[in-house]
Amino acid sequence: MIYLDNAATTLRKPPQVIDAVVAAMGSFGNSARGTHEEALAASRVIYDTRCKLAALFGCKRPDHVAFTCNSTEALNIAIHGCIHAGEHVISTDLEHNSVLRPLYRLERENNVKLSFVPADRQGNIDYADFERLLRPDTRAVVCTHASNLTGNTLDLACIGAFAHEHDLLFIVDASQSAGVLPIDMEQMHIDVLCFTGHKSLMGPQGTGGLCVREGVDINPWKVGGTGVQTYLHEQPEQMPTRLEAGTLNGHGIAGLNAALDFLQETGVETIHAHEMALLRRFVAGVKKIPGVALYGDFDHERTAVAALNIGDMDSGEVSDILSEDYGIATRPGAHCVPRLHEALGTEEQGAVRFSFGWYNTEEEADAAIAALREIAT
């Protein structure tokens, strides 16, 4: 099988990631739930992983890295915990439902007002629209770093400067960029960075988290056992305990720790360069196929994602043919980004997404081009 669905999850992990998960399953106790060696072993690895994530993302305090099951949970914690009834939020048309649905819920239940920076037919935005949409009651900007459909990226430094100038919270969804694009919370004025571990970070599924700038108070979305301050009726105030009720996924975090070592040794820039070389090769070949429509802006910084359609064929049909006849795994449909499909004019047809990863090869990119050529003729 040729796996080109890395934007959904990286199927091939560094071998040390798998080894670390297996080792942890045989040796870890429950972090912060005892002083015996097995519990302490889990605690040490979890803290070490916080430190590595803080260094990767430019978060000043490792204890402000809180673990979750994925970026969806992290975004729910950030959005529900930071935005209050009646406030106004600016977002964009590029957003995943992990951002949109929490915002829509607040709109329905808490009278939160929403404005969206529109996307054009290439999936780009006009950054001047942030100023245009600003209101006296604006509380936050919530946006993605990279589109999971087109691969287009947003200029976080530009948006962060706008948010900082107007004293707004800046919450970022880094699901598609963490581990493949440089992120610096301080330089980009990011208040809360939400990430998942199983995509470009190449860690296990069931891992993710949020990095919180010092001074940003998030009301806990869930509360419960913490292993400390048992007699408090409320969730403890200190981070990361405030946002980590219940047992952490220590086994998964051990795998994420090993993945972060691999990223450090290999280099985020090296990984991104490899993936982009494959994308450029793929796009150049696809552009020569009559009847294929590509979506997105391929002239600016982006991730290694290409979305396309063949004539008026349903995207699901194309993806099924690729899988069943050619052994190529892709992602069809709406990709949980309804507003962006509306902007691109693909809400009925959807799109077939090809997403390249570290373990893909030129031969696999060429095979995908050849398959599309046959399907299109």
Q: What annotation goes with each model-predicted range?
A:
Residues 1-377:
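Pyridoxal 5′-phosphate
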